[in-house]
């Protein structure tokens, strides 16, 4: 990826939405994060590793910088926007009970699936339906995200 440019971008998006938190906001796209999502840890950033007990721990350093800053950059968007009334619409409807993906790749005999594409919306925007449309035709390496909502 683009290393720290990604984190600087996520930090900038977070600050911009913080300034505009009283507006109706929609933020959607490919964020290339998180690394994992599960019932125990919720969101797991790329700066975290899962220990022997299954708990996510932030690495001291990551990709030539502080792991804490990287984790905060990813976490600020994926779960932190809730502080401004902007939520991940997929998780709002399904919590962490439902696993899905928008991107996948094969590594040897292992298929890795990640939910990199997101739709975030202000609380006043009611999401009625949201789903990833998986298609074998591979127009893109990501699955489109269909979202229906009302204001």
Predicted features, each with a name:
Residues 1-151:
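Active-site regions of metal-assisted phosphoester/phosphodiester hydrolases
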């Amino acid at each position: 990826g683009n290393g720290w440019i990604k984190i600087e971008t996520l930090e900038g998006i977070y600050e911009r939405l913080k300034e505009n938190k009283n507006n109706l906001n929609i933020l959607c796209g490919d964020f290339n994060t998180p690394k994992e999502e599960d019932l125990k840890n919720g969101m797991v950033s790329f700066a975290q590793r899962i220990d022997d007990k299954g708990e996510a721990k932030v690495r001291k350093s990551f990709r030539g910088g502080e792991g804490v800053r990287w984790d905060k950059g990813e976490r600020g968007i994926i779960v932190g926007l809730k502080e401004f009334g902007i939520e991940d619409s997929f998780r709002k409807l399904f919590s962490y009970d439902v696993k899905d993906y928008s991107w996948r790749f094969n590594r040897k005999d292992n298929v890795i699936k990640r939910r990199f594409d997101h739709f975030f919306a202000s609380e006043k925007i009611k999401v009625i339906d949201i789903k990833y449309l998986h298609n074998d035709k591979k127009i893109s390496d990501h699955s489109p995200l269909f979202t229906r909502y009302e204001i």
